[in-house]
Design a protein with these regions (language model features):
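P-loop NTP-binding core
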Residues: 1-147
Length: 147
């Protein structure tokens, strides 16, 4: 439906205008990660799931660890299928909707824009993204209305 494409193109467009942009792939399918060329995301040592898991388990973490830089000028927090297990972990967590916001809090000072690509359903990961967001873009498909 264009969510990943919108996130990618908007991020690269902003980067080309001299803005510092961080893309967050919050969809376990990892299409944003793949679109930027990381096709072996399962082999990455640190992903969004890794960092969120550390927050949930109250473990120390380096906030900018695992951020990858792309030649188009954007940075990305990649994801892989491991993120799908995060939905289950978040269900029983305290302040579960704040996990992503807590992670991104320290990163905000390093970027002009943080764009979060979400999955097409309203699960705990999407709720986390909405809680962390200052603004929301909802791509819709235009249809002709008869009459």
């Amino acid at each position: 439906m264009g969510k990943t494409t919108t996130t990618l193109n908007l991020g690269i467009g902003l980067a080309h205008q001299g803005r510092k942009v961080l893309l967050v792939d919050a969809d376990p399918q990892g299409d944003l990660t793949t679109a930027l060329g990381w096709t072996d995301a399962d082999d990455l040592p640190v992903t969004l799931a890794t960092q969120m898991k550390k927050i949930l388990q109250d473990e120390p973490f380096v906030y900018n660890e695992g951020i990858l830089h792309h030649e188009e000028g954007v940075d990305i927090i990649p994801t892989n299928i491991e993120l799908s297990g995060m939905e289950i972990s978040l269900v029983n967590a305290m302040s579960r909707e704040q996990t992503l916001k807590l992670y991104l809090a320290d990163l905000k000072k390093d970027y002009d824009y943080i764009l979060i690509d979400c999955m097409p359903s309203l699960g705990m990961l999407t709720i986390n993204a909405l809680t962390a967001a200052d603004s929301v873009i909802v791509p819709v498909e235009a249809h002709y209305l008869p009459g």
